[in-house]
Regions:
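Extended alpha-helical, oligomerization-prone segments that build pores/tubes and scaffolds
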Residues: 1-292
């Protein structure tokens, strides 16, 4: 008997619809647009994830006896994507692709509320976060940020934010055990382990083993045009720079020629004018003429 594939196809279509609904519900379309924008403009787009995220669903229940409506939120685990700006993405400088990276560092810029909310996420150290909050904001504005924020004329640009570094990569096994990471017996033969660490104000906010099986860096890097000798790709502006310079030169030349071709030509008998006069032409110009 020939097996029927129709039920399997229907199940696959329903699962595909579920995945699309979950991605739309977690702003995945916005994240992907951000990645594509930087890929085209800057040459490289970076997507992080997917991760599992506990989303709060707002729901209300009605008491059958009293008829009162009570707020009863529910938690639901959904996938989540994150767009990482290339300005906040620091890969292994010796790597030419994400597969070649030994480690990756992502920079976060969080306000006090966002940093405090990290206490509610798994494996974050509440005491270290409280200590970091008491130290105050530590964000250092980079030189390129004045151009990104369109504030080139501001001499002292400051941001009241916490600068947090998220590290994904390898760590010496002995150092990991010293830092408090519990290792399984199956890792006794390893010299190094893959970890995830969050650091702010010299405080370790989170330090865990890489949760993925098999272990991998949770970043997807998409260059617009691959540069085989560098990690980051080439975008449209850099790709068309030479052609744009040629077009700009022709435009300037056409304007200069138009200014000359559209100008007036005068024939002046200076013997009829008072000596020492300026020969420039402008509205309201008066030439002093000698009598005769």
């Amino acid at each position: 008997q020939i097996p029927q594939i129709q039920p399997a196809r229907q199940a696959a279509e329903r699962l595909e619809k579920l995945i699309h609904d979950q991605l739309e519900g977690t702003s995945a379309i916005t994240m992907l647009r951000h990645v594509l924008f930087e890929m085209v403009l800057l040459g490289t787009g970076v997507l992080k994830g997917p991760f599992t995220h506990d989303e709060v669903l707002h729901a209300w229940d009605t008491d059958e006896e009293t008829g009162e409506t009570m707020y009863n939120p529910k938690a639901k685990t959904v996938p989540k994507l994150e767009a990482v700006s290339v300005w906040d993405f620091y890969p292994d400088p010796d790597a030419t692709s994400i597969e070649d990276c030994d480690y990756v560092i992502q920079r976060h810029s969080l306000n006090r509320t966002q940093l405090r909310n990290l206490k509610n996420r798994p494996f974050f150290r509440k005491k270290a976060i409280s200590e970091c909050l008491s130290m105050g904001e530590n964000y250092e504005v980079r030189g390129f940020e004045t151009s990104l924020l369109d504030r080139e004329n501001v001499d002292d640009l400051k941001k009241k934010r916490f600068e947090i570094y998220e590290y994904w990569g390898s760590m010496d096994k002995a150092l990991a055990e010293e830092a408090g990471i519990e290792l399984d017996d199956s890792m006794n033969d390893l010299d190094e382990v893959q970890i995830n660490a969050w650091i702010c104000n010299n405080q370790v906010l989170r330090l865990v083993l890489n949760p993925f099986t098999p272990e991998r860096l949770p970043f997807h890097v998409c260059p617009y045009e691959i540069n085989p000798y560098q990690f980051f790709g080439v975008g449209i502006p850099e790709n068309m720079e030479d052609a744009q310079m040629v077009m700009n030169g022709h435009a300037r030349m056409a304007i200069d020629n138009l200014a000359l071709a559209g100008n007036l030509v005068f024939d002046i008998d200076e013997t009829q004018l008072v000596p020492g006069q300026d020969m420039s032409i402008y509205p309201g110009k008066i030439f002093r003429r000698q009598s005769g």
